[in-house]
Amino acid sequence: MNKNYLKKSHKKIALIDCNNFYVSCERVFNPKLEGKPVVVLSNNDGCVVARSQETKDLGIAMGVPIFKIRELIEQHQIEVYSSNYVLYGDMSGRVMATLATFSPEVEIYSIDEAFVDLSWLSGDELIQYASLIRTTVFQWTGIPVSVGIAPTKTLAKVANRIAKKNPQHQGVFLCPESEAEQDKILSGISVKDIWGIGRQYSKWLINEGVTNALQLKQTPEWKIQPKMGIVGVRLLRELQGVSCLELELQPKPKKATCVSRSFRRPVSTLAELKEAVLTHTTLAAEKLRKQKQCAAAITIFILTSRFKDNYYSNSITLPLPVASNLTPELIDLAIKGLELIFCEGYEFKKAGVIMQGLQPENIRQGNLFLQDYDSTKLEKLMKTIDQINKRYGRNTLCWAGSGVNKPWSMKRENLSPLYTTCWSEIPIVKASFQNYLDLIEEQF
């Protein structure tokens, strides 16, 4: 393509990224964690998925199994937490709602990142406004964020990295307009750290002599496209200041929804597997109703540990007569599918369900052979159950078949309370009456 057609972008795209998000969520409600090394673990308390800066400084890598750092944990008194996804999801919603007050154009990119269009601002105004965003998010939610601003999404990612890694920028960095200054910055960014460059592509690029972002920017498109396709070409142009990735202000409808968990301990009985599959199906149905979607088919899968002998895995996909998001209908089909693929004599490590063929609940296709099908009563029941669980906490009302004790359930030995979503776990602030009187006295 003629380069004259590729115009430099004059947009001002800000990437707001929450700093050490999972750890920051824990610190909001437990200030004693400030300044201490903290790690958050993956499902079943297996591996490190989030680290405080203090933990990073100790050399603990992302994804390291917890058993490999037991000595370091004891030696440095590292605080260990299980993943509290309900808390993190709620805090994420609060951060994103705060960002929406600063711009009508916000793309929620992930649980802890968002792109915001600030193109109506320029120069010092941008720095001041970004600093205001940063201060307000922290005041309203307690979550520290970094802000990187640039003409394209990819350069905004680079700018955010600089804002986060260099304290002198006070959490805000504006990509310079001078191409020479941009190139100087890009020369210090490893190709491994560029947004959209995975392990395989980075390995190939390094073998080709492309080790940093500047070298990638200067690589001809004809060399990139055969290996990395149109995605690689867009990335290349974004590094050159040509905006190829628009903000996605409306999330794309999901094509599938999966709920699966590894078990705390191996499960060998059909009864316990039914409890797990029923639990996962219930959660998946809740997600569908929240997304206002219905599933046309459901896939059930089970598997044993890959690291043990006698490995077994199986799955089955069953269609629904009419696309549905109603828990009883989905449970019936899921249990039938499980019974068809279950095999005695195995110790299963994981089970899950995948809702497929998702479609909007208001335009789902009917079934010519089910003219008497009427889901009105079930829909009202689901709506009532959802409202009760939303008000009083998840699983206030649940299906008896999902079990009570659930010895197979996910290991979460260091789980923090549901501070923001469960009435019984809301933190209590204690203050003496004398302190109140002293405060009144100060006012007058």
Please name every model-derived segment.
Residues 6, 193, 201-347, 431, ...:
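DNA-contacting surface of Y-family translesion DNA polymerases
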Residues 1-237, 246-247, 286, 375-444:
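Gly/Gly-Pro- and Ser/Thr-rich, intrinsically disordered tail segments characteristic of DNA damage-repair
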Residues 34-36, 76, 143, 294-296, ...:
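A generic structural signal for short beta-strands and their flanking turns/coil linkers
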Residues 335-391, 395:
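C-terminal hydrophobic structural anchor segments
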Residues 115-119, 315-321, 365-370:
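Short, hydrophobic beta-strand segments
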Residues 109-113, 150-153, 293-297, 346-350:
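Short Gly/Ser/Thr- and Asp/Glu-enriched loop/turn motifs at secondary-structure junctions
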Residues 122-126, 308, 359-366:
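Short, charged/polar, Gly/Pro-enriched secondary-structure boundary elements
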Residues 155, 308-309, 360-362, 405-407:
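Flexible loop/turn segments at secondary-structure boundaries
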